[in-house]
């Protein structure tokens, strides 16, 4: 074992020191951003969104969440257990809504990403792409340090060169670089930092989120790729700190889990209503999706 002696920081360890600003009002701040990437043929692609994205979890990565967020400029990564027919129905509805509002047909769908696991086939992606334009896909795995993840990224990139590929999760520069060179456009940063995640408690694996973002963002940006902070945000200021640390996107789970559009079961306790929130590697999630 090697002990890392450098100070490692989390969101609650720092504050943002103010600086001079040319802005007269917060209303002048442009919160939309256009993200660009190119495939092996050099063809440039892009999408525009407010770079805050609902996590691809059973509670937050729901179709109802995708409808509301995408229409308001935000993003949603659908949880991986949706059938392609359900996603196609969602995209059809969003496209119809966009046309009725005199917007580009992909105005809303560009902000909704699919999710696959490391052992999943590409059938669902193929079925959706037959019917609609798909902007991005998340390759989701609890341990982004498995060597076979690199092979999976290469497979997705080879078959779908036009897709914006998000891969995670990692917390160090070396694997960030490896996955980008394999074909990833964006890395999800964070292990054990999520509200529903018990990785740190059960295995002792993880890294303070702010330091992870800083280092991984530096590595990714040198290769013209992006990073997505995933986990650890409990209050709005944490989102601000993640962006200041270099995150291009911020993924939210717990902060959205109580919304009406979230998928958790509602229950009442001491006269107050709550929604169930669970991690995707939890016993509850495994029993729900795999029996």
Functional labels for PLM-detected ranges:
Residues 1-27, 182, 204-229, 233-291:
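Alpha/beta catalytic cores of nucleotide-metabolism and tRNA/nucleoside-modifying enzymes
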Residues 8, 71, 130-133, 159, ...:
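Alpha-helix termination/capping residues and helix-transition junctions
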Residues 65-66, 123-131, 165, 171-189, ...:
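Catalytic cores of alpha/beta
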Residues 56, 116, 141:
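Short glycine-centered, acidic/aromatic-flanked micro-motifs in structured strand/loop junctions
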Residues 71-87, 136-146, 185-203, 233-266:
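Glycine-rich phosphate-binding active-site loops on the catalytic face of alpha/beta enzymes
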Residues 1-113, 277-280, 288:
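N-terminal capping/small domains of soluble enzymes
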Residues 44-54, 104-115, 134-136, 155-171, ...:
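Short beta-strand/loop segments at the ligand-binding rim of alpha/beta enzyme cores
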Residues 82-102, 119-126, 141-165, 170-181, ...:
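Active-site-adjacent beta->alpha loops and helix N-cap segments on the catalytic face
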């Amino acid at each position: 074992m090697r002990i890392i002696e450098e100070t490692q920081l989390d969101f609650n360890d720092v504050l943002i020191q103010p600086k001079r600003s040319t802005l007269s009002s917060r209303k002048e701040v442009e919160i939309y951003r256009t993200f660009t990437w190119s495939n092996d043929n050099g063809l440039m692609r892009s999408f525009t969104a407010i770079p805050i994205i609902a996590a691809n979890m059973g509670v937050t990565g729901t179709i109802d969440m995708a409808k509301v967020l995408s229409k308001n400029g935000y993003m949603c990564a659908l949880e991986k257990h949706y059938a392609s027919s359900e996603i196609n129905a969602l995209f059809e509805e969003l496209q119809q809504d966009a046309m009725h509002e005199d917007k580009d047909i992909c105005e809303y769908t560009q902000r909704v990403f699919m999710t696959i696991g490391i052992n999943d086939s590409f059938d669902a992606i193929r079925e959706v792409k037959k019917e609609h334009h798909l902007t991005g896909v998340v390759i989701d795995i609890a341990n982004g340090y498995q060597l076979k993840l690199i092979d999976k990224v290469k497979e997705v990139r080879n078959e779908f060169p036009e897709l914006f590929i998000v891969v995670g999760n990692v917390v160090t520069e070396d694997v960030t670089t490896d996955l980008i060179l394999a074909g990833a456009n964006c890395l999800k940063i964070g292990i054990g930092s999520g509200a529903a995640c018990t990785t740190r408690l059960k295995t002792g694996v993880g890294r303070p989120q702010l330091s992870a973002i800083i280092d991984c963002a530096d590595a990714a940006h040198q290769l013209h790729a992006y990073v997505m902070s995933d986990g650890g945000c409990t209050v709005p200021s944490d989102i601000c700190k993640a962006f200041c640390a270099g995150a291009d996107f911020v993924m939210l789970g717990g902060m959205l889990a109580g919304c009406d559009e979230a998928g958790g079961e509602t229950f009442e306790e001491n006269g107050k209503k709550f929604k169930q929130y669970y991690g995707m590697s939890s016993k509850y999630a495994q029993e729900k999706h795999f029996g």
